[in-house]
């Protein structure tokens, strides 16, 4: 028998110490990685619940194990809320991650060797959109489109490549693109060549849910997303679609048993919490502020003479090119880290450095907005970052910024009393 008094603190001091240090880091550091956010205590409560004990292969009402009557209720809640949130007719909440959701889509609708047309990783796409190092680039014939000299997706190039290569599927989505995707144009191109349109909205799902970014569901054959990032839920995946019995059946089979076994019902419960939170009016206010904050930060960098890829942002993220300053993203990342500002190095278009070094930084505002930052704080923060980038090895500047970071983080904690 287990005692509920047997906590990690009592049982495993080494692990508990590391967990506490990470919790302190999250409170004391400013988080600007575009794919990170902070979940609510309710989301974490669901993930740490007794649901982790339950095996439930199959789908609600069609399980291969007994004792699933309550997890059926939980999973159906998550499904229904996801459909309501995004205006979808179909939702599969079982994918363990966004990459697994994407793999399931490929498995459902493609054959090995089929051609896919996706955004180049070097131009802001994602590994799973056909990058050579990913299974999506190994199992399928991946053709890549990119951005033009102004940092915008070249839709004429997308159409030209589609006509030339006749892909079975066109992939729209990104990991580092700061503009609005033209879903109607993607749909028209897909229809012209008889391709499926698959949209990966992992980065902007929260913005879509709040109505501050266009919804791809009415245009795409299938849509995937993660449930963290801007959606602010647990780490996991989600597949959405309009009504199509054939595609729905293929997607369900591709998730289970095609690529996964038992679903993580404790994570699915956390997804249900997340979807309920995203259906509230205050979530729209939050997402509007996320975009305002990103625009405010990008504006400061432009004023200080830095190159923002695409000239600004229309969503939650933007890329900063440091080619002109001859600074590597790796060195900039490390210097900002010493000031308790967490970012990630990122390749930029025409980057002369390797992906392990890069010449750019990616910034995102979901996490700082969750802790209460508004435009004023974000402009001040961007100024501090510019000060460090202007003199990367000046430890006095880094030390001064770190103290300012600690002060503002104490004023605006992630988790209050």
Swiss-Prot record:
Residue numbers carrying N6-(pyridoxal phosphate)lysine: 229
Residues engaged in binding (6S)-5,6,7,8-tetrahydrofolate: 121, 125-127, 354-356
Stated family: Belongs to the SHMT family.
GO biological process, one term: glycine biosynthetic process from serine
Name of the protein: Serine hydroxymethyltransferase 1
EC numbers, comma separated: 2.1.2.1
Function summary: Catalyzes the reversible interconversion of serine and glycine with tetrahydrofolate (THF) serving as the one-carbon carrier. This reaction serves as the major source of one-carbon groups required for the biosynthesis of purines, thymidylate, methionine, and other important biomolecules. Also exhibits THF-independent aldolase activity toward beta-hydroxyamino acids, producing glycine and aldehydes, via a retro-aldol mechanism.
Keyword GTP-binding among UniProt keywords: no
Catalytic activity: (6R)-5,10-methylene-5,6,7,8-tetrahydrofolate + glycine + H2O = (6S)-5,6,7,8-tetrahydrofolate + L-serine
The protein's required cofactors: pyridoxal 5'-phosphate
Protein's gene: glyA1
SUPFAM superfamilies reported for this sequence: PLP-dependent transferases
Alphabetical UniProt keywords: Amino-acid biosynthesis, Cytoplasm, One-carbon metabolism, Pyridoxal phosphate, Transferase
Pathway membership: One-carbon metabolism; tetrahydrofolate interconversion; Amino-acid biosynthesis; glycine biosynthesis; glycine from L-serine: step 1/1
Site-annotated residues for Plays an important role in substrate specificity: 228
Annotated localization: Cytoplasm
GO cellular component, one term: cytosol
Signal peptide: none
Assembly description: Homodimer.
InterPro entries in UniProt: PyrdxlP-dep_Trfase, PyrdxlP-dep_Trfase_major, PyrdxlP-dep_Trfase_small, Ser_HO-MeTrfase, Ser_HO-MeTrfase-like, Ser_HO-MeTrfase_PLP_BS, SHMT-like_dom
Alphabetized GO MF terms: glycine hydroxymethyltransferase activity; pyridoxal phosphate binding
């Amino acid at each position: 028998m287990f005692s509920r008094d047997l906590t990690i603190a009592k049982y495993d001091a080494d692990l508990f110490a590391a967990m506490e240090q990470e919790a302190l880091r999250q409170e004391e550091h400013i988080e600007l990685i575009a794919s990170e956010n902070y979940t609510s205590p309710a989301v974490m409560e669901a993930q740490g619940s007794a649901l982790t004990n339950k095996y439930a292969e199959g789908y609600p009402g069609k399980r291969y194990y007994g004792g699933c009557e309550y997890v059926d209720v939980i999973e159906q809640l998550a499904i229904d809320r996801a459909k309501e949130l995004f205006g979808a007719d179909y939702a599969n909440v079982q994918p363990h991650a966004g990459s697994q959701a994407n793999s399931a889509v490929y498995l459902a609708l493609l054959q090995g060797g089929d051609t896919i047309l996706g955004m180049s990783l070097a131009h802001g796409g994602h590994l799973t959109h056909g990058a050579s190092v990913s299974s999506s680039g190994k199992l399928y014939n991946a053709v890549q489109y990119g951005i033009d000299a102004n940092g915008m997706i070249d839709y004429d190039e997308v159409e030209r490549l589609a006509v030339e290569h006749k892909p079975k599927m066109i992939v729209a989505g990104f990991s580092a693109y700061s503009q609005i995707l033209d879903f109607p144009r993607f749909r028209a191109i897909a229809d012209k060549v008889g391709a499926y349109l698959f949209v990966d909205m992992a980065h902007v799902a929260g913005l879509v849910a709040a109505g501050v970014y266009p919804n791809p569901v009415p245009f795409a054959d299938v849509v995937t997303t993660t449930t963290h990032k801007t959606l602010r839920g647990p780490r996991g995946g989600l597949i959405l679609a309009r009504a199509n019995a054939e595609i729905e059946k293929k997607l369900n089979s591709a998730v289970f048993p095609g690529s996964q076994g038992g679903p993580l019902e404790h994570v699915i419960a956390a997804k249900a919490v997340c979807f309920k939170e995203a259906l509230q009016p205050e979530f729209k206010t939050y997402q509007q502020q996320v975009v305002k904050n990103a625009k405010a930060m990008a504006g400061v960098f432009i004023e200080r003479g830095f190159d923002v890829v695409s000239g600004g942002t229309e969503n939650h993220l933007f890329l900063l090119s440091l080619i002109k300053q001859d600074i590597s993203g790796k060195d900039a990342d490390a210097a900002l880290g010493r000031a308790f500002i967490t970012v990630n190095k990122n390749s930029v278009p025409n980057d002369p450095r390797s992906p392990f070094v890069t010449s750019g930084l990616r910034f995102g505002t979901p996490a700082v907005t969750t802790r209460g930052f508004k435009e004023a704080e974000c402009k001040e923060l961007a100024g501090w970052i510019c000060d460090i980038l202007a003199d990367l090895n000046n430890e006095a500047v880094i030390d001064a910024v770190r103290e300012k970071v600690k002060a503002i983080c104490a004023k605006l904690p992630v988790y209050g009393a």
